[in-house]
């Protein structure tokens, strides 16, 4: 065996794709594949995309009304998303993590929480969710500058590609996006009342933010091949399901292990078993971003110029997708009409997509409500599900920025071949499961004690006490 086989890669070519290794999503009362299923039921009932409404329940009884119960629902949703996205991932390895929330300006007057409190709270956000998510053996390592506060965070995706290129030893990254009424309240000024956001006691206010949380793991699986050379020499733990490295066995490797920034210890054979069990759900293609403003005046392009720019971007982004995109997930936010600009652009690009067909056209705000800063990642998650299950390709277009459009291709790892198994079921541990019902084939279990958060009136609690302080509750079985 060459000594080179024992060393990590030291350079990286330009990357055009990253593998989607895991996804987890909570969206209002839905979890994981329930969202895609609800969208398909809509399509079957209404073929015309313009006439499709929201999948969110219209019955106010489906939602909690007290402030405590609203906070409880938010806590469950954010923990469920992390559990679904991380539970089958490699344990004991600190996965580099990016946290994405809505825009926040520390210089805003009269903030609800001090900048120091907010920075600290966001920095521990994902790690603190491990316990309520039942992820006791998983490890989180925040990336430097890995807290992203941005209302239109699709730029994170290009940054991920650059990160992998700059760090050839990096095998995977977790992106955790968290949006909702509670997050909006925590990051806002006191001049914005919690009542206006829908965060206090009372029925749900139509048009308020949709709670949307996504855990997305992307990576390059081949980058751990050098660790396979060391694995046979690692000690087998007394608890054989424990993947942690606790030293060498009776034999030492012929080449000294040298830690890297992202691989501080050798991986055991059990760790590699967990890694190799991860499916590749999709290929995430490098985003294509184009300006929608005139280079001289800064004014937004209009009519033919806008159509030509969007058409050129579509051709570039879809060139690497095989087959051509079968559907488009797009989001212009509230009070926007993306179809008016997209339809002529796709026509000019000679795309076969029919954006008036509900099976091919998904306006995220129209169908899911306002998912805010989580929108690009909700689109990627849905595109991953759709393309994996159908063996085809999808396109995601965040369009909330008026000065720029971003196109993100998602393709099946096995084009033209539909899988036998659907991996997007709601498989939550009973002690952390949401009230959506027991996991498939699971025996009914008694309701577990619930954990909730509250913001005492008139008290300036730290952000983590608003979002993460724990209060036992056994008198309300949340249906969310």
Swiss-Prot record:
Pfam families: Tla3_C, Tla3_N
Keyword terms, alphabetized: Cytoplasm
Record's protein name: Type VI lipase adapter protein Tla3
Subunit structure of this chain's protein: Interacts with the Tle3 toxin on one side and with the H2-T6SS component VgrG2b on the other side.
GO molecular-function terms, A-Z: identical protein binding
Protein location: Cytoplasm
Record's signal peptide: none
InterPro entries tied to this protein: Tla3_C, Tla3_N
Superkingdom: Bacteria
Disordered: region residues: 410-458
Role this protein plays: Adapter protein that targets and loads the Tle3 toxin onto the H2 type VI secretion system (H2-T6SS) machinery through an interaction with the TTR domain of VgrG2b. Seems specific for Tle3.
Lineage of producing organism: Bacteria, Pseudomonadati, Pseudomonadota, Gammaproteobacteria, Pseudomonadales
GO CC annotations on file: cytoplasm
């Amino acid at each position: 065996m060459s000594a080179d086989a024992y060393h990590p890669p030291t350079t990286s070519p330009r990357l055009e794709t990253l593998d989607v290794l895991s996804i987890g999503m909570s969206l209002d009362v839905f979890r994981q594949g329930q969202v895609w299923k609800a969208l398909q039921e809509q399509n079957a009932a209404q073929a015309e995309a313009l006439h499709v409404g929201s999948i969110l329940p219209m019955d106010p009884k489906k939602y909690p009304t007290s402030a405590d119960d609203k906070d409880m629902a938010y806590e469950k949703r954010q923990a469920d998303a992390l559990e679904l996205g991380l539970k089958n991932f490699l344990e004991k390895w600190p996965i580099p993590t990016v946290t994405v929330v809505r825009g926040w300006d520390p210089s805003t007057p009269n903030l609800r929480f001090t900048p120091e409190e907010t920075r600290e709270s966001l920095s521990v956000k994902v790690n603190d969710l491990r316990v309520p998510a039942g992820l006791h053996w998983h490890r989180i390592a925040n990336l430097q500058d890995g807290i992203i506060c941005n209302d239109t965070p699709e730029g994170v995706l290009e940054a991920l590609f650059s990160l992998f290129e700059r760090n050839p030893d990096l095998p995977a990254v977790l992106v955790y996006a968290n949006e909702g009424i509670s997050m909006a309240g925590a990051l806002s000024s006191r001049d914005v009342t919690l009542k206006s956001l829908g965060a206090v006691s009372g029925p749900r206010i139509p048009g308020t933010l949709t709670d949307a949380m996504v855990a997305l793991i992307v990576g390059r699986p081949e980058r751990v091949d050098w660790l396979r050379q060391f694995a046979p020499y690692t000690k087998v733990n007394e608890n054989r399901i424990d993947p942690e490295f606790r030293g060498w066995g009776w034999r030492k490797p012929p080449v000294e292990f040298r830690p890297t920034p992202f691989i501080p210890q050798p991986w055991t054979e059990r760790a590699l078993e967990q890694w190799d069990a991860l499916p590749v759900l999709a290929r995430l293609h490098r985003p294509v971003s184009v300006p929608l403003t005139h280079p001289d005046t800064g004014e937004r392009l209009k009519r033919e110029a806008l159509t030509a720019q969007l058409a050129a971007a579509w051709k570039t982004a879809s060139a690497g997708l095989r087959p051509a995109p079968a559907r488009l997930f797009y989001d212009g936010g509230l009070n926007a009409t993306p179809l008016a600009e997209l339809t002529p652009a796709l026509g000019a690009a000679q795309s076969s997509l029919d954006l008036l067909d509900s099976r091919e056209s998904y306006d995220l705000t129209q169908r899911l409500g306002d998912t805010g800063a989580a929108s690009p990642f909700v689109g990627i998650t849905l595109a991953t599900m759709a393309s994996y299950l159908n063996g085809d390709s999808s396109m995601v277009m965040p369009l909330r920025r008026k000065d720029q459009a971003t196109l993100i291709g998602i393709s099946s790892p096995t084009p033209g071949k539909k899988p036998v198994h659907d991996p997007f079921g709601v498989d939550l541990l009973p002690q952390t499961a949401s009230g959506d019902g027991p996991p498939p084939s699971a025996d009914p279990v008694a309701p577990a004690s619930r954990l909730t958060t509250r913001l005492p009136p008139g008290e300036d609690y730290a952000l983590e006490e608003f979002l993460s302080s724990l209060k036992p509750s056994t008198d309300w079985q949340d249906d969310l």
